Structures are given as C-alpha cells and as structure tokens.
C-alpha cells in the first residue's frame, strides 16, 4: 500500500486536472498549500505546447497560484532538448503557436522557420491553436521527402471549459493520412 508520508514530490498535470480553461478546481489551492505546509514539493507537467512556461506562470498567478519557471516540465521543453541533441543545425519548419516557437528559441533551438522552404530539413509540430491550412499544406508537402517529423505530444484532444478541442495528435493524424509519415512523439503518452 502507498504510504503518502513517504512522498516528497508530487507531479500535477494541468489542463483538466488542476483547472479547466480559466477555472481553477475548488480543491487545487488547498491541496497545493497542504503539500507545501508538509515540507513537500510539487511540479506542474503538461503536454500542452500552445503556451510557454512564462505563459503558464502568468496563468497560474491569475488563478491565485504562485509558481516559478522552475516548477514546470513541458512537452515544449522536452521537444527543445530533443531538437538540440538530435537535429542541431538543421533547418526546421515549425507548426505551432508563437509561444511554442519562442519557447523553442529560448531553450536554444536555432534555425526555426514557420513558412515553407525547399531547404527545410525537418518538420516539427506542437498543439497549434493558430493552425492554418497553409501550415498543413507546408507540412504535407515537406514530408513527401525523407525528412524527420517530430511532434511535441501525441494527445488527440485537449480539455477546455466547453469540451474538447483537437490537440497535436489530431493534427499529426491529418498529416499522417495525407503523407503516410508518422511523427516521432516527444511528450508523455496518454497511456
């Protein structure tokens, strides 16, 4: 049996776990306060790459939760680490929000482009709430070549206050259906 007295670090998902949209769940503040008061720690984890860590710090502050940038582990950060280690120097087409592109750049990823070019060497996508048909078309066209296809996370949907919306995995499913290419997923799986 799990002895909660031995737990020192708690990991919390965010979307649909501690809040939904801009609505904090009633138990969240008290739970986090109790964890801190008992001398333990917590980190926030998310596959949602549509926001940067600084966006999340601001969002939690608006919801009444104090957090520092070091309190987060995101699929954007993990994607940046992967790209730096495996595709350094490659010219990347990135489909994602402005925050996703900024997060990659702030984490040391270089040569990021958000428009089609013949010399692109890899395709990267995240949860793109600013998705356009032009981005879908560019990814499909680029992936007719034998280049890497990297995705921030496999989530098919993201919970919101009004239901679910298509997430990174759904966009990847469209691209896979169009090209036959499957992405290499970085973020944690839904399993």
Language-model features: locations:
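HAD-like aspartate-dependent phosphatase fold
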Residues: 1-14, 18-191
């Amino acid at each position: 049996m799990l002895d909660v007295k031995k737990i020192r670090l708690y990991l919390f998902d965010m979307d649909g776990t501690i809040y939904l949209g801009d609505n904090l769940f009633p138990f969240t503040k008290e739970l986090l306060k109790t964890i801190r008061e008992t001398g333990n720690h917590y980190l926030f984890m998310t596959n949602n790459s549509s926001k940067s860590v600084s966006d999340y710090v601001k969002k939690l502050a608006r919801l009444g939760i104090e957090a520092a940038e070091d309190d987060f582990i995101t699929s954007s950060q993990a994607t940046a680490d992967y790209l730096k280690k495996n595709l350094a120097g490659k010219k990347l087409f990135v489909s994602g929000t402005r925050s996703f592109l900024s997060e990659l750049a702030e984490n040391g990823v270089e040569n990021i482009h958000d428009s089609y070019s013949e010399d692109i060497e890899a395709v990267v996508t995240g949860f793109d709430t600013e998705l356009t048909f032009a981005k879908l078309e560019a990814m499909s066209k680029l992936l007719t070549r034998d280049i890497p296809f990297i995705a921030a996370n496999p989530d098919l949907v993201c919970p919101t206050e009004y239901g679910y919306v298509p997430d990174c995995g759904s966009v990847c499913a469209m691209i896979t259906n169009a090209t036959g290419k499957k992405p290499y997923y970085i973020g944690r799986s839904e399993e």
